[in-house]
Each structure stands twice: as structure tokens, then as C-alpha cells.
Amino acid sequence: MVTTQNTKARVTSVSHRRSQQDPESPVKKFFKLVLPSTMKDKMMKIPPRFVKLQGSKLSEVVTLETPAGFKRSIKLKRIGEEIWFHEGWSEFAEAHSIEEGHFLLFEYKENSSFRVIIFNVSACETKYPLDAVHIIDSDDDIIDITGKEFVGTQGTRKNNQSVNGGDTEHKSKKRSRDIELDKILHDLDVMNPMHVLKEEEEDKRVFRG
């Protein structure tokens, strides 16, 4: 019996020392239920426990990103020991049709960046909108068949060509390609056996004459 009690005491002592030595694992995820006050105040409070463990790592502006790649910068508001998603939050909520009763899961990805998964009142993950800014960026460097280079869907010319200048340069390149093609065809014609035979017959006639 004494041995058993001593063993329990040692286990308790080791467990106590381990809990004191091991730092508390930082919280990476938290969820928020959208309340009427959230919609009214146009900002969302970050849970106090997350603020206590990770708040010192957050910069003045954080990034929220959805699984669809939609990103927005949100400015934080600090009130005492509280931290709120503030400027930019209402626009993010509006873009994703976030309403009272929606459930949001936040995952901290370091560098003041959060991944946000949104569940609507059906308790299912919502359909995320595409990021218009991201779409425009992905359309950069589009080259049409006339050889003119544009940016995105706005038709802004990236190079320094004017309309006429671009056409002139395009025509110049076309002439260069035509000359190169003619040279290749000429070389092929010279290598043609019939062409070589004709040249030999011509040489014989000149020699006989």
C-alpha cells in the first residue's frame, strides 16, 4: 500500500512539474456567432482568450481570406484589453452576405492573417464569392492577335506603343517573317533534284557553245 501511494505521489509530482514547464499551446482557431449587435456595430470582437495568447502578435491591420481566395485587409480596433475587427469588416461581411445567425470559423495563419470559413443558417458552408480584384490580376499580360498588350479587362495598354506605332511595328515584324520564309523556300527550291538537273543541262549547253 505504501508503495502504491508513493508511486501515485511521484506521478502527481512529475505531472505537476511538466504542466509548469511546458508553455501553454497557443490557440490558433476560434469561432464567432453573428449576433444582432455584430450587425448593428459593424465590427466583430475577437475572443478574449485568443487576444490574451496571440493579441501581441497582431499588427494594426490583418488579412481575412476565404477558401475561395477572397482577401481583404481589416483594421483592428483596440479598446482596453479587447480587440475588434473594425474598418473593412462591414464590407467583408456585405461581400459574403453575412447575417445574424451565421457561424464563422477563424484560423490564425501567422503574419496577422486569418482563414475564415463561413456557415449560414442552414448550418452548411456558404458559397463564397470570387474576388474581383484577384480576377483582374489574373488577367494581366493578355496579348491579342494584333500583337498589342493590355492589362486585365480595362484595356489599358502596358507597353509604350501608340495605336499607329503598334501597327507599324507589327507590319515591320510581319515583313521580317515574310523575308525569312522566302529565304527558306528558296533554299528548299535549290535543293530540289529537278532544279539541280536543269542547272547541269544549262552548264552543258554553255560549255558546248
From Swiss-Prot:
**Name of protein:** B3 domain-containing protein At3g18960
GO CC, alphabetical: nucleus
| Species annotation | Arabidopsis thaliana (Mouse-ear cress)
| Segments crossing the lipid bilayer | none
Q: Which residues bind DNA?
A: 29-122
Q: Where is this region: Disordered?
A: 1-25, 154-176
- The UniProt entry's coiled-coil ranges are none
**Keywords on this record?**
DNA-binding, Nucleus, Transcription, Transcription regulation
Q: Which InterPro entries match?
A: B3_DNA-bd, DNA-bd_pseudobarrel_sf, Plant_B3_domain
Q: What is its main location?
A: nucleus
Q: Name one GO molecular function term.
A: DNA binding
> Which compartments does it reside in?
Nucleus
Q: Which SMART domains match?
A: B3
